[in-house]
């Protein structure tokens, strides 16, 4: 398990302007402190936008350190076409403080930042063709493991890629890289012989019935158990952009130790990171 750093973040001030009924802008000043004795590179900063009460639908944002703009990303995490979080990456020297200015707007922006992460989910279609999809749901009794290309969503930074199996295993399978770059859009997790000869990475582990590099499992008192039976399974892509990529695996009605559980495993990878953050969310206390 990667030891996470402690970053202290404070929202100092906000200035709200609303020129028209459909137009709004809000400026925030954010103070960040690195209290560790080591430098931090590509440290994620995440702002919960729902707590800001902006008063308008946030459609774009810019983040500034002095006169330097920092790539940022707005993410809708619940599928309601509203941005829930703003994320950006910063470099922080040891025992240092920095101030950032964030401008939120109700106006759309055509601004594009260089991609540092990517998430992919594909489904097979007619004549062996496949389409990019953002999610897929099926009854727990259905075998859709081979319906989805590379058996579930794939997620990557420049340093590593993973895929999450779309079945009762929900195994996390790694794809190792030789060069620092995004590759999954080109290789789809299965590089050709020519691509491997040109320095592309490859599926690095035969996971069988294991947890791969790490996966949540049940426990029957003597051994780990897969996530079954369930009423319904869904896997989806939530974000893919310059700062982070997010995918989810959701099960409804998991029969486990006398309970019916609804669970979401949310996987987040940031640019410049090999580690992947996994949040396990239940709809009620266990």
Where are these predicted regions, by residue range?
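Gly/Pro-rich turn-and-neighbor structural signature
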Residues: 133-140, 250-258, 277-279
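Bacterial Sec-dependent N-terminal signal peptides
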Residues: 1-27
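Solvent-exposed N-terminal domain segments of exported/luminal and surface proteins
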Residues: 101, 106-228
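Residues within well-ordered beta-strands of beta-sheet-rich folds
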Residues: 99-103, 248, 277-281
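Alpha-mannosidase-like glycoside hydrolase catalytic domains involved in N-glycan trimming
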Residues: 22-128, 138, 142, 150
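Short, ordered beta-strand-loop transition motifs
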Residues: 22-24, 76-83, 147-149, 236-244, ...
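Acidic (Asp/Glu-rich), glycine- and aromatic
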Residues: 263, 274-286
């Amino acid at each position: 398990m990667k030891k996470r750093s402690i970053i202290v973040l404070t929202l100092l001030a906000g200035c709200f302007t609303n020129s028209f009924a459909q137009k709004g802008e809000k400026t925030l000043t954010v103070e960040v402190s690195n209290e560790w004795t080591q430098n931090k590179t590509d440290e994620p900063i995440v702002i919960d936008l729902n707590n800001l009460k902006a008063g308008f639908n946030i459609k774009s944002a810019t983040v500034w350190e002095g006169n330097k703009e920092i790539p940022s990303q707005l993410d809708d995490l619940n599928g309601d076409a509203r941005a829930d979080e703003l994320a950006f990456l910063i470099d922080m020297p040891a025992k240092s403080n920095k101030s950032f200015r964030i401008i939120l707007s109700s106006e759309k922006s055509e601004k594009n930042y260089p991609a540092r992460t990517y998430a992919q989910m594909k489904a097979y279609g007619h004549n062996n063709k496949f389409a990019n999809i953002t999610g897929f749901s099926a009854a727990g009794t259905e075998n859709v493991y081979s319906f989805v290309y590379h058996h579930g969503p794939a997620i990557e930074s420049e340093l590593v890629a993973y895929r999450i199996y779309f079945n009762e295993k929900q195994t996390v399978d790694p794809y190792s890289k030789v060069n620092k770059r995004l590759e999954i859009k080109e290789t789809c997790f299965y590089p050709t012989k020519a691509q491997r000869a040109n320095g592309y990475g490859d599926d690095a582990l035969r996971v069988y019935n294991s947890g791969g590099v790490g996966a949540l499992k049940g426990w029957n008192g003597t051994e780990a158990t897969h996530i079954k039976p369930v009423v319904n399974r869904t896997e989806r892509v939530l974000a893919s952009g310059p700062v982070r990529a997010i995918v989810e695996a959701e099960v409804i009605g998991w029969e486990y130790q006398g309970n019916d559980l609804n669970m979401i495993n949310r996987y987040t990878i940031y640019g410049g990171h090999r580690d992947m953050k996994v949040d396990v969310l239940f709809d009620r206390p266990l």
